Amino acid sequence: MKIKVGVIGCSGRMGKRILNELITNTQVEIAGAVARLGSKYIGSDIGSAVYHSSNLGIKVTSSISDVFESSDVVIDFTTKECMLACLKAAMKFKTPLVSGTTGIESINLKKYAAKIPILWSANMSVGVNVLLKLVKKAAEFLDNEYDVEIWEMHHNLKKDSPSGTAMEFGKAIANALKVDFQPYQHSHNSSNIREKGKIGFAVSRGGGVVGDHSVMFINSDERIELNHKAIDRTTFARGAVRAAIWLYENKRETPGLYSMQDVI
């Protein structure tokens, strides 16, 4: 029996790619799809929402509750406000939730995860999550003898800075080094000397860059760089679908807060 997956934010850049991945994946079927109120896709078949050539028999809706009620697991890539509505619906219907929504620092996910299975990751790319494991291991080997700098670049419409992915790298390194996570951004008008033990961040924004990340370990003799470049957003969509399948098959009866690190 196929896993019924709902999609919140189906008319967005990520939502469309997730629907495409669901359409081509033989393990799942689309249970429902939500677009924002006022979207031109409301009431239309989801086939047209993802530029698919044929109708799929499911209409795009604005009702988050309806989609959670009819789904085995739901994928959300939206905003903080919409994610809060998703969490409430997930609690009501006991539906596992996968989310890649960022800028949610004020939401206490652990509170909700005590009642329902939630998988949240700032980046659903398998490659980025493999890199995260490598970064942790590098930090353990190198200890506090190296300065750490994290650079990220994204498209010119991205709102959060540094990116959620860059922050996850920083937290993982701080944890491996057993130090407090103190993100540090050096500005051109600052006269402060680089403080030892702080994790530096540099941010670039431009064009349509999907996502570049570089983690550097530097001392006076050498520099080690670990890099990842996302070529297409499909990598995030594919990872999100993989996460949804994993969450439903392995944790649907086990409340908790999971991440892509558990999946790969």
Swiss-Prot record:
Pfam short name (any one): DapB_C
Residue positions binding NAD(+): G9, C10, S11, G12, R13, M14, G100, T101, T102, S121, A122, N123, M124
Domain of life: Bacteria
Xref: Gene3D superfamilies: Dihydrodipicolinate Reductase, domain 2, NAD(P)-binding Rossmann-like Domain
Main EC class the enzyme belongs to: oxidoreductase
GO cellular component: cytoplasm
Record GO biological process: diaminopimelate biosynthetic process; lysine biosynthetic process via diaminopimelate
Keywords noted in UniProt: Amino-acid biosynthesis, Cytoplasm, Diaminopimelate biosynthesis, Lysine biosynthesis, NAD, NADP, Oxidoreductase
Enzyme Commission designation: 1.17.1.8
Catalytic activity, as annotated: (S)-2,3,4,5-tetrahydrodipicolinate + NAD(+) + H2O = (2S,4S)-4-hydroxy-2,3,4,5-tetrahydrodipicolinate + NADH + H(+); (S)-2,3,4,5-tetrahydrodipicolinate + NADP(+) + H2O = (2S,4S)-4-hydroxy-2,3,4,5-tetrahydrodipicolinate + NADPH + H(+)
Keyword NADP: yes
Role according to the record: Catalyzes the conversion of 4-hydroxy-tetrahydrodipicolinate (HTPA) to tetrahydrodipicolinate.
Protein name in UniProt: 4-hydroxy-tetrahydrodipicolinate reductase
Species: Wolbachia sp. subsp. Brugia malayi (strain TRS)
